[in-house]
Amino acid sequence: SNTITIIMGKDNRLFWYQQAVADVKAADLNETDYSAKGIRSEIQKKKIAALDSSKFTVIIKPTDEANFKNTVDILDEMEITGNKLFALVDLQQNEVDAYKEKMKTPKANN
């Protein structure tokens, strides 16, 4: 896949997935954190594995519960990982539903 979607949530929780948005369920959301070993590592691994790394795109979707610092942090990761193709967009309803379901689970220890 040439894309990764990142969902920024409440309490600094961060999720990512790589599939068609219409098919996303809570079980598809992989939890990580804002560290170098967290989301940065995931972005780098997915970019290397992409069909065309020059077209690799990060789709950033902050929830209403995400804070401004998290947005700054994820934009910093775009710079650090050299991702020039990224977009900040709203969540679709099925992503909101998957996120709310996932938030019922304890925070992952990364």
Per-region residue spans from a language model:
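Long, low-hydrophobicity, acidic/polar, solvent-exposed interaction domains
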Residues: S1-N110
